[in-house]
Amino acid sequence: MKQFLFLYLSLCSVCLSYSQEGLRQLLNDSALKHASVGIQVTDLNTGKTIVSHDPQKSLTPASITKVITSATALELLGSEYRYVTQVTLDESDPTRILVLGSGDPTLGSDVFGDNTTAFFINITDALKKELQPDREYSIYVVDNLFGYDGISPEWTWIDIGNYYASGSYGISIFDNTYKLFFNTSAKIAPPRILRTEPDMKKIRFTNFLTLNTTGSDNGYIYGIPFSYERTVKGNIPAGKAEFSIKGDIPDPGLFLGETLADYLVRSGIKISQVETARTDYLAKKQVQYKPGKIVHTLTSRPMKDIVQEVNVKSNNHYAEHLLRIIGRTQNTDIYSDALQAGIDYVKKFWEQQGISTSSLTLHDGSGLAPQNAFSPAFLTEILAYMYTKSKNSKVFFDSLPKAGKDGTLRSFMRNTKYEGKISAKSGSIGGVQCYSGYLIDGNKQYAFTVMINKFNGTRSQVRSAIEKFLLSL
């Protein structure tokens, strides 16, 4: 027995020495010479630290913020939670069609391989059975669940207007995203605009795009929510008959209503007006409507599927909606700030689980805000809780991409001993590279967070340095 104990302790000592050497090499890597580095690796079986470096330092996290958002959503709402969007007739005005938004980010989404237009086809078929072809009808889209501050005030101008920074509202459609197509075959700048998909009839583009010969996509669309003026800058590849970049739909609720109107008109139903609740909301006007007969109900996929999309594909749009629905469940007043209520609940919930949030500064649910900050120790504690205490442990673990296999980790740790054995979320914005998740290899069961800010090397050099460190564990 004593010999076995001695052997076990000796092996542990060897493992720790390897980890410490791996940490030393990471910190001395030339790509990180001027960087801020925070690391925490915790043994999930014992709760003890395997290796750490400045674990309490608050650093910019980028998309590993989604670990917090997705974990909190699962704990509050459950893995089977579903958004429900209803189309009803208005009892107080029989000529008014109501679309009642629930904050579902998946309406018309192509993420899950569904027919993106099925929502409109099914509603049209259902309404044709209820409406009279000789009467005129209006559409009122109730999209005010989260209010109309759809983006974080801490997002940067370079992001606003692009698809990955789309607004979050009570109604979404087509991932709140459109494609803008160009013809660059003439190799003359600015390239000719061909079309948008879906057809964004109202948007006016000011085109400052130039062309490159590298084949890289550096095109960006700038513009604020609810404005139809968009500026296009940057550069895109020359010599293409068609090339597209993506932007955010300025007013998703109105676009959904107008698209539904087009479907109804083509089916023989007369539509005289399309409105959203925005004007009435901003005027604090109490609109009298009474949902009557439910004509169509659309139920989203369960939360477990949505969370997996958030973490595997790093879907900002879904993550932002999750944080706001968290907030709205805590404060049902539609004039309260759903984003701030969500942030407040995140802090409250994790404090209740005995995890200090003193290092946490949160401005969104996706990690796009560069002012977000928290410590590696904080996030690793959440990971440990989700693995050892949460009833959603398996759902959460399965939502994280596998190293060398899928999602944002497809090329990370590929062809190494830990391929498929690390399940983690990556995070990267300018000068930031982070990884947070689990290493499960037999009896070796670790939660880890690696956060690197303001590195001077290339991103590939930093990723390689992190891979070498993880291989030392």
What does each model-identified segment do?
Residues D54-L59, K246, L368-A369:
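A short glycine/serine-rich beta->alpha loop
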Residues S36-I39, V307, A319, Q433-S436:
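Short glycine-rich loop/turn motifs
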Residues Y18-S58, L77, I121-P133:
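Beta-lactamase-like hydrolase cores
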